[in-house]
Amino acid sequence: ADVLLELMRRLEAHHTRTLSIYVPEPIFFSAAYRISYDRMCAIIDDVNSRAPSWMNSFRFCLDSPVGKVRRENLNMRDRTSHHLVFMRDGQRIDYPDLPEALDSPGDVKTMLWKMR
């Protein structure tokens, strides 16, 4: 959340409003660049609670073959098999969640190294 908040503040300073933040569709061998659904939800909640009102009106979406889906579209979740099912416009979207064992947050100092 700290990284997103800092980047959003910098965009605001350049008069650029953040409208959407996308989590990319999972592809093979992409685990190093992904986050789990639980961590994504925690980041959304943290950013929304800490960002000023003019900054927290963005939408946080998961990319899917039929378009963007939000957590409000979550229809079913199986934590054992790490499987999520979203429904959008009557279409079912199966989404593999990243197991928590593979989900390790990056170092904030490393991610914001150029901001110092």
Q: Could you say what each language-model-derived stretch is?
A:
Residues 12-116:
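Auxiliary Fe-S-binding modules of radical SAM enzymes
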